């Protein structure tokens, strides 16, 4: 059996008596006692997640912008100011999603990308192939010397500033999806991005791995609650945010995964997968579902791979959970394109067909329930 990978915070999680699980080959905390309380901390105050299993990759060279114009489906032409970030899919020639990622622009010769843990090796091999085929001459460097801590919630930024006072000046004016580099902190040189995966405000902090445990402990002392993968999943689902490998993969078009907004077909770029997207168009709708209650009770919980029956044909739930914020069972589903917001569909749970309402995503954003 292959040994699990450990983040630099593994000992810290175990010291907090975290329940650890195998997450894509990484030994990760699913919770530290109460997933519900961790979820609530992020919605109402501040929680933090170890996301050091994700991989930072640095791209340097004179043609780095041209490389990303070809490599990703979103348009790096939108990246004009240092620190600006862009969410995009990385596509194969068939239009399937190799990964979803965030690209940060710092200079015309330096871009930084954060990719998912389970796809990092595949992504880096693909980047290297595109670099070689296109003769871009870039240096592509995975940075496993970095760790990442996501601090999320309405009070997250204030608690980061209390922990790292020297970061306030550089980050207090940051708009969402922007990052700043903060040098010379007690935790080393940091990259602090106003991004996240919870539907709340906050920062994702890229920190030298050798300093991350000290930062983690300092954040805890300033009232930031450690949170595990369990709360991360319920938070991202409420926030309408896709999970790679579950809501989309190499065989699924972003147009069929609710990610059309991340694909820029307006600019005349020859990006990988464009021809396939234009040929196939949108073949399915990607929607939210809320399980209907009978006599105030839901007859089950919506889960991935349950069948969705509609008058227009069958679909499938890609992600599902019980929402702590809404006290409802919620899901994402890929369904026939004719299904409309407001429709009622049937979900096969065990041996029953139970009604669910089709809603627009997201369910919750900035602590407010949006889907009714």
UniProtKB/Swiss-Prot annotation:
Any one Pfam family match given in the protein's UniProt record, by short name: GCV_T_C
Gene Ontology terms, MF aspect: aminomethyltransferase activity; transaminase activity
Keyword annotations: Aminotransferase, Transferase
Protein name (database record): Aminomethyltransferase
InterPro entries according to UniProt: GCS_T, GCS_T_bac, GCST_C, GCV_T_N, GcvT/YgfZ/DmdA, GcvT/YgfZ_C, TrmE/GcvT_dom1
Superkingdom, natural source: Bacteria
Subunit structure: The glycine cleavage system is composed of four proteins: P, T, L and H.
Top EC category: transferase
Gene3D superfamilies xref list: Aminomethyltransferase beta-barrel domains, Aminomethyltransferase fragment, Probable tRNA modification gtpase trme, domain 1
EC number: 2.1.2.10
Catalytic activity: N(6)-[(R)-S(8)-aminomethyldihydrolipoyl]-L-lysyl-[protein] + (6S)-5,6,7,8-tetrahydrofolate = N(6)-[(R)-dihydrolipoyl]-L-lysyl-[protein] + (6R)-5,10-methylene-5,6,7,8-tetrahydrofolate + NH4(+)
Family of the protein in this entry: Belongs to the GcvT family.
Record function comment: The glycine cleavage system catalyzes the degradation of glycine.
Swiss-Prot/TrEMBL GO biological process terms: glycine decarboxylation via glycine cleavage system
GO cellular component, one term: glycine cleavage complex
């Amino acid at each position: 059996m292959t040994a699990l990978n450990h983040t630099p915070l593994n000992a810290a999680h175990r010291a907090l008596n975290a329940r650890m699980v195998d997450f894509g080959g990484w030994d990760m905390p699913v919770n530290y006692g109460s997933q519900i309380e961790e979820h609530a901390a992020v919605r109402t105050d501040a929680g933090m997640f170890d996301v050091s299993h994700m991989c930072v990759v640095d791209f340097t060279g004179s043609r780095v912008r041209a490389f990303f114009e070809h490599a990703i489906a979103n348009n790096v032409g939108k990246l004009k100011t240092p620190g600006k970030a862009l969410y995009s899919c990385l596509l194969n020639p068939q239009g399937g999603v190799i990964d979803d990622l965030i690209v940060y622009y710092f200079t015309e010769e330096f871009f930084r990308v954060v990719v998912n843990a389970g796809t990092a090796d595949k992504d880096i091999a693909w980047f290297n192939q595109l670099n070689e085929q296109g003769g871009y001459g870039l240096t592509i460097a995975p940075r496993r010397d970095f760790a990442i801590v996501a601090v999320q919630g309405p009070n997250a930024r204030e608690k980061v500033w209390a922990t790292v006072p020297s970061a306030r000046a550089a980050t207090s004016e940051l708009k969402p999806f922007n990052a700043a580099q903060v040098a010379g902190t007690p935790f080393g040189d940091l990259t602090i991005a106003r991004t996240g995966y919870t539907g709340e405000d906050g920062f994702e902090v890229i920190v030298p791995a050798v300093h991350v445990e000290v930062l983690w402990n300092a954040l805890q002392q300033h009232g930031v609650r450690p949170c595990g993968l369990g709360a991360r999943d319920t938070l991202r689902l409420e926030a309408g945010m896709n999970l790679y490998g579950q809501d989309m993969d190499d065989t699924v078009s972003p147009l069929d995964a609710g990610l059309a907004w991340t694909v820029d077909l307006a600019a005349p770029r020859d990006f990988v997968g464009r021809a396939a997207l234009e040929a196939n168009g949108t073949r399915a709708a990607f929607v939210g579902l809320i399980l209907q209650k009978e006599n105030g009770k839901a007859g089950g919980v919506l889960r991935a791979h349950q069948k969705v029956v509609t008058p227009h044909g069958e679909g499938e739930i890609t992600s599902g959970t019980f929402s702590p914020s809404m006290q409802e069972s919620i899901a994402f589903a890929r369904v026939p394109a004719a299904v409309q917001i407001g429709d009622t569909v049937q979900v096969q749970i065990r041996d029953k067909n139970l009604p669910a309402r089709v809603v627009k995503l997201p369910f919750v954003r900035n602590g407010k329930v949006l889907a009714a």
